A protein has these predicted regions:
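An anion/pyrophosphate-binding glycine-rich loop and adjacent beta-alpha core
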Residues: 78-81, 90-214
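A glycine-rich dinucleotide-binding beta-alpha-beta segment and adjacent secondary-structure elements
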Residues: 25, 198-277
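A conserved FAD-binding loop/helix module that cradles the flavin
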Residues: 58-71, 75, 275-300
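Flavin (FAD/FMN) cofactor-binding core of flavoprotein oxidoreductases
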Residues: 1-9, 83-94, 237-254
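Short hydrophobic core segments
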Residues: 29, 48-63, 71-73, 124-129, ...
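Glycine-rich nucleotide phosphate-binding loop and flanking beta-alpha elements
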Residues: 31, 60-63, 133, 143, ...
Length: 300
């Protein structure tokens, strides 16, 4: 296996040539119009008639400009809002320059108006604007939709995901008794990166040279909250051209099982133009291929 996109492309081109399928490349589609039982497509200013059309125009993800969605306006087809998905989250805070560049294992939970939506576990990349990483991107479409609806979105970061919150005090006390005369930071430095740990301890109002047994209950509680439930408000997602995919598009309720439009016979959709998005790991590419197979089997 060459594992290159060029090899896949060449395989398709070879099969297209074998089947003697006519292709018109490097052409701009200026408009689509329904005329009786056919579709009139304006190609490079020239009108062409087709029995069936497959809309497979991708999305705005990764692109600064993509006006292909306007092609469907002339048919009066409405789409759900096109929003970033599989993208980093921009958070509210004044200390992100201090944690920028840190990678840490954590559980990320997302809340909408203080209502839990979903969580994911993995490596979180801490940045100067907020957070990124696969587990963050897997939750980003939920944040996009909630922010679009003007709802308050928060993330809860758990840097001790393998310990129940109610057991952290007991666990820290045991470490403090076992690792004699260690400061709070020294107790945790082998588990959480020092730079991040210093921020979490400072935010709890604790001096870096303090020992855990000397802390007040309030200080311990604040520290435990920062370690296992650091709560930050999501201000925005990164721009759509920096996202890997989008959420939104043609509603699934608008299409048949064959992905043909319920209103316009002979009009089909494949891939990301449909309001379908998945998590990282090839699911979005897989849907693009599978939807193409479904459509091709129906039109042939």
């Amino acid at each position: 296996m060459s594992n290159t996109a060029t090899s896949v492309l060449n395989a398709f081109l070879t099969e297209i040539e074998r089947l003697k399928i006519k292709t018109i490349l490097d052409s701009e589609i200026n408009g689509i119009k329904k005329i009786e039982n056919k579709y009139q497509v304006l190609v490079n200013g020239k009108k062409m008639l087709f029995d069936k059309i497959i809309i497979s125009i991708g999305s705005k993800a990764g692109l600064k400009e993509n006006n292909n969605y306007e092609l469907l306006n002339s048919l009066g087809i409405k789409m759900t809002p096109i929003l970033p998905a599989l993208c980093p989250l921009v958070l509210n805070g004044d200390f992100f320059n201090k944690w920028s560049g840190i990678r840490v294992e954590a559980r990320v939970s997302i809340y909408e108006n203080d209502r839990f939506l979903k969580s994911d576990l993995g490596e979180v990349q801490l940045t100067d604007y907020g957070i990124s990483g696969i587990c963050v991107m897997n939750l980003s479409s939920l944040a996009s939709k909630a922010l679009y609806q003007k709802k308050k979105v928060k993330v809860h970061l758990n840097f001790l995901p393998n310990i129940e919150k109610e057991n952290i005090d007991k666990w820290l006390t045991l470490r403090d008794n076992t690792l004699y005369q260690r400061t709070v930071i020294e107790l945790l430095e082998s588990i959480i990166p020092y730079k991040l740990l210093y921020i979490l301890v400072s935010k709890a109002g604790i001096k870096s040279n303090c020992h855990y047994k000397s802390l007040t209950w309030e200080e311990k509680n604040d520290l435990i909250n920062n370690l296992s439930d650091l709560t930050l408000e999501v201000r925005d997602t990164k721009e759509i051209f920096k996202s890997q995919v989008v959420t939104g598009g043609i509603p699934i309720s608008r299409v048949k099982d064959t992905l043909e439009d319920k209103e316009y016979k002979g009009l089909y959709y494949t891939g990301e133009i449909l309001d379908v998005d998945g998590i990282c790991g090839g699911f979005n590419l897989g849907f693009a291929w599978l939807s193409s197979i479904v459509v091709s089997e129906d039109i042939c």
